[in-house]
């Protein structure tokens, strides 16, 4: 191994160059590895000898065998070509140009050759595809013709046209002659008689012999096996139902066998052909047989056809019920936070998966969705406090519920939901009306909203309650800062001044020409509270001249209330009566 990394790289480069150049060396002596060291020579002499040999070999080969090393990923063709051309002589340059020209012409020739070859192949393949398409269309047409011919070969046809009047007579006859079926079976709206076949035999699985003559009645969703309706004495006149299968729950298949038909039943003692039918239901197999193969094949084909239809209908109905159940769950349980206390919500949640609710929802789905969407818009309007649109939307929903003729549970649920949303809007409006600093214009607007919702009386109560708290708050502030005589005077002034302002605002807000009894009673309550406050302040004090002056001054504050035709003197007279008793 070389003593240092640079000598190692030199040897590695020389070995790579020599391995490439050695392919062009014809004789065996030159094919020996140039890196082998001769015995008896020093390492330095061998290295110089290898360099001279490498230079000689490179000079004899093509110019592309120049010892150029580059990174494949970052290779720059222009710079590489410049490096190659800068050391070339004129002859070498001409030789390189001729070689490149030959390569170019060869590539062009190959491209043209491949183009015409591929074009011919494309034209050939296109023709084959067009021919195959034509053959396929002919094959499809032939299949349709064969299907029509095959159906025409089947001479057994026991179907009934549902529009034919005779089908009603046939069903009525079967209804009166078959025992073991309730009235609900015949009154099913979607049930239709497909075919009826007689002279079938119920086969004993153990000995493969017939044991009973039966009839086969195929409906679009059921398969009935009844006792044969014979007029002999040995057989009853009425048909008894032996099997009543749901088509979606059975597996039906035909069996080809030959064997004894049963002399007791057929009154024959010879070998006859029986065409058997196997029906599997709940891991239990039932065998039936008939002499006519066409009857059996027709029964199998019709049963499988309607079985497939029933399975498709069941799958579609199952998907619809699942979708309806999820939609109902969204419409109802999304309101759990607001509607959990309502009885209609609780009852509807318990019956979400019942068939009655799902069928009712299927009929009234569009209306329920439309009403739910209106409620969603209403919730957005309430959250944005767009009360004009919200109140209009409430009226629209109310009108739709009255005319919609919804299912009882849906109607009760939406009615309670509407009541809940009205309550929400009313609470927000009452809360805003109770603000102490509400403006007159805003207050009038809120009162109009409450009037349209039918809660104007509640608004009046909230207004009076908020003003009661305002008067108490102001009187409390006076009590903390004034002595007793001044306190009485200040409180009386505040109370009567607030009552006068409140009266004026009350008349304007609620658009009244005169005060209603409820408001008059509220004013009297405030004056009585003032009198109680004064009496409580002088409970342990002497009613001297200061008291008399304060009480007399209070009478002057009553002027504004007198102008509003409110007589508070009977209540204020209590203050003078107390003073008179003290003087006595």
UniProtKB/Swiss-Prot annotation:
InterPro entries reported in the protein's UniProt record: Cullin_repeat-like_dom_sf (IPR016159), Exo84 (IPR033961), Exo84_C (IPR032403), Exo84_C_1 (IPR042561), Exo84_C_2 (IPR042560), PH-like_dom_sf (IPR011993)
Chain's role: Involved in the secretory pathway as part of the exocyst complex which tethers secretory vesicles to the sites of exocytosis. Plays a role in both the assembly of the exocyst and the polarization of this complex to specific sites of the plasma membrane for exocytosis. Also involved in assembly of the spliceosome.
Protein transport listed as a keyword: yes
Renumbered residue ranges of the record's region Disordered: 19-45
Name assigned to this protein: Exocyst complex component exo84
Localization, UniProt: Cytoplasmic vesicle, Secretory vesicle
Biased composition (Polar residues): 19-35
Gene3D superfamilies: Exo84p, C-terminal helical domain, Exo84p, N-terminal helical domain, Pleckstrin-homology domain (PH domain)/Phosphotyrosine-binding domain (PTB)
Alphabetical list of Pfam families matching this protein: Exo84_C, PH_EXO84
SUPFAM superfamilies: Cullin repeat-like (SSF74788)
Subunit composition and interactions: Component of the exocyst complex.
Keywords carried by this UniProt record: Cytoplasmic vesicle, Exocytosis, Protein transport, Transport
Annotated GO biological process: protein transport; vesicle tethering involved in exocytosis
Gene Ontology cellular-component terms listed: cytoplasm; cytosol; exocyst; mating projection actin fusion focus; transport vesicle
Organism: Schizosaccharomyces pombe (strain 972 / ATCC 24843) (Fission yeast)
Leader sequence segment: none
Family statement drawn from the similarity comment of this UniProt entry: Belongs to the EXO84 family.
């Amino acid at each position: 191994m070389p003593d240092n990394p640079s000598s190692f790289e030199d040897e590695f480069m020389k070995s790579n160059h020599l391995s490439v150049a050695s392919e062009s060396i014809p004789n065996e002596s030159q094919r020996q590895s140039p890196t082998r060291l001769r015995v008896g020579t020093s390492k330095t002499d061998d290295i110089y000898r290898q360099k001279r040999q490498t230079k000689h070999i490179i000079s004899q080969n093509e110019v592309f065998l120049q010892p150029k090393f580059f990174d494949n990923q970052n290779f720059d063709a222009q710079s590489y070509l410049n490096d190659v051309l800068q050391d070339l002589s004129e002859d070498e340059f001409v030789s390189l140009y001729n070689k490149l020209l030959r390569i170019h012409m060869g590539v062009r020739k190959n491209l043209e050759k491949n183009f015409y070859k591929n074009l011919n192949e494309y034209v050939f393949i296109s023709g084959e595809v067009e021919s195959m398409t034509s053959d396929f269309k002919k094959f499809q047409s032939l299949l349709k013709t064969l299907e029509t011919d095959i159906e025409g070969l089947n001479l057994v046809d026991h179907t009934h046209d549902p529009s034919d009047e005779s089908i009603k007579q046939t069903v009525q006859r079967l209804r009166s002659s078959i025992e073991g079926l309730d009235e609900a079976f015949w009154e099913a709206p979607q049930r239709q008689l497909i075919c009826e076949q007689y002279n079938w035999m119920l086969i004993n699985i153990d000995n493969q012999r017939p044991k009973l003559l039966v009839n086969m009645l195929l409906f679009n969703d059921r398969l009935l096996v009844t006792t044969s309706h014979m007029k002999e004495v040995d057989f009853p006149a009425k048909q008894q139902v032996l099997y009543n299968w749901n088509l979606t729950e059975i597996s039906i298949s035909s069996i080809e066998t030959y064997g004894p038909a049963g002399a007791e039943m057929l009154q024959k003692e010879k070998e006859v052909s029986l065409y058997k039918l196997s029906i599997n239901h709940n891991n239990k197999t039932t065998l039936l047989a008939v002499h006519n193969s066409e009857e059996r094949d027709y029964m199998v084909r019709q049963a499988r056809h309607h079985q497939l239809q029933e399975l498709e209908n069941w799958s579609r109905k199952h998907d619809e019920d699942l979708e309806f159940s999820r939609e109902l769950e969204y419409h109802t349980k999304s309101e759990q936070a607001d509607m959990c206390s309502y009885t209609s919500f609780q009852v509807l949640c318990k019956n979400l998966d019942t068939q009655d609710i799902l069928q009712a929802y299927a009929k009234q789905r569009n209306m329920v969705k439309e009403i739910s969407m209106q409620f969603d818009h209403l919730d957005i309007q309430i959250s944005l406090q767009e009360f004009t649109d919200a109140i209009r939307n409430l009226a629209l929903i109310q009108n739709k519920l009255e005319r919609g003729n919804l299912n009882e549970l849906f109607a009760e649920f939406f009615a309670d939901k509407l009541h809940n949303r009205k309550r929400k809007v009313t609470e927000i409006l009452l809360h805003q009306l109770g603000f102490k600093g509400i403006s007159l214009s805003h207050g009038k607007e809120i009162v109009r909203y409450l009037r349209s919702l039918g809660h104007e009386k509640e608004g009046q109560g909230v207004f009076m309650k908020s003003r009661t708290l305002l008067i108490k708050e102001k009187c409390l502030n006076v009590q903390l800062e004034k002595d007793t005589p001044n306190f009485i005077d200040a409180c009386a002034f505040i109370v009567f001044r607030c009552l006068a302002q409140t009266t004026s605002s009350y008349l304007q807000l609620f658009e009244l020409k005169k005060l209603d009894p409820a408001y008059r009673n509220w004013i009297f309550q405030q004056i009585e509270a003032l009198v109680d406050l004064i009496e409580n302040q002088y409970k342990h004090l002497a009613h001297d001249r200061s008291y008399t002056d304060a009480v007399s001054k209070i009478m002057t504050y009553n002027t504004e209330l007198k102008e509003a035709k409110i007589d508070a003197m009977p209540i204020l007279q209590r203050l003078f009566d107390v003073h008179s008793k003290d003087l006595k």
